[in-house]
Amino acid sequence: MLFNYQSLLVGVSLISQALSAPILESRATADAAAFPDLHRAAKLSSAAYTGCIGKAFDVTITKRIYDLVTDTNGFVGYSTEKKTIAVIMRGSTTITDFVNDIDIALITPELSGVTFPSDVKIMRGVHRPWSAVHDTIITEVKALIAKYPDYTLEAVGHSLGGALTSIAHVALAQNFPDKSLVSNALNAFPIGNQAWADFGTAQAGTFNRGNNVLDGVPNMYSSPLVNFKHYGTEYYSSGTEASTVKCEGQRDKSCSAGNGMYAVTPGHIASFGVVMLTAGCGYLS
């Protein structure tokens, strides 16, 4: 959500500030060891905003992802350093993205290679942009698996890109059930009902939610009026190893659920020591 930041702050606040937070508990524990992977995920997420060509840090880009109608944007590639095949999704930069961010109408998802339970519902504003590029991404990942059969899979994104990552994780897990998979969704809002969260939780692989202090976006749509549900393991940080904690459950008050914020806030543009759009592409690293 980097498009016209002030407009986003006002527009999303109108939707979400009126929502009350659920009951919270505090159980987070220090986990500095998680920081390096989340910092790398933040750099790759920033690179998706930058529009890197050829390479983004350790990832060699093999396919740019773009759909004109939905403005879905990102890239697929591989890392010889990490021995992984990566799907990286960009967050919001345009009016089209912003419209997707606030389109919370629930729909029944349909994606090739994915068998959804009948009661799963997700927001149209995330399903529509992902479904526009789903087949392209799965085809490219399949081709890379053929070239690098021993590589693992990963999905990464920030904000709307993080919300798309929550679908990417399910899509990759279902289409490639024999592959090891780790996904990192940064500063993302929840996108579906409890059945969706249960389905995401049931997938093979590891799904992490990385959140920044003073960011209200992870709390959007999570309170009783909308009642969307997160899944995965949350990590919370002010941008350093020492401040990184592993949260317990989805409503740990030591983490994003307890910061009292329910909209786009200044803390949203940073993640695990990286300010989005400022990290470059790693060409000189």
Curated annotation (Swiss-Prot):
UniProt keywords, alphabetically: Hydrolase, Lipid degradation, Lipid metabolism, Secreted, Signal
Active site: 159 (nucleophile), 215 (charge relay system), 268 (charge relay system)
EC number: 3.1.1.3
Presence of the UniProt keyword Isomerase in the record: no
Temperature curve summary: Optimum temperature is 30 degrees Celsius.
Domain of life: Eukaryota
Primary enzyme class: hydrolase
InterPro entries noted in UniProt: AB_hydrolase_fold, AB_hydrolase_lip/est, Fungal_lipase-type
Alphabetized GO MF terms: triacylglycerol lipase activity
Main location: secreted
Pfam family, one: Lipase_3
Reactions catalysed according to its record: a triacylglycerol + H2O = a diacylglycerol + a fatty acid + H(+)
Functional note: Secreted alkaline lipase that hydrolyzes acylglycerol lipids such as triacylglycerols and consequently releases free fatty acid. Is able to hydrolyze tributyrin (1,2,3-tributyryl-glycerin).
Protein name: Secreted alkaline triacylglycerol lipase
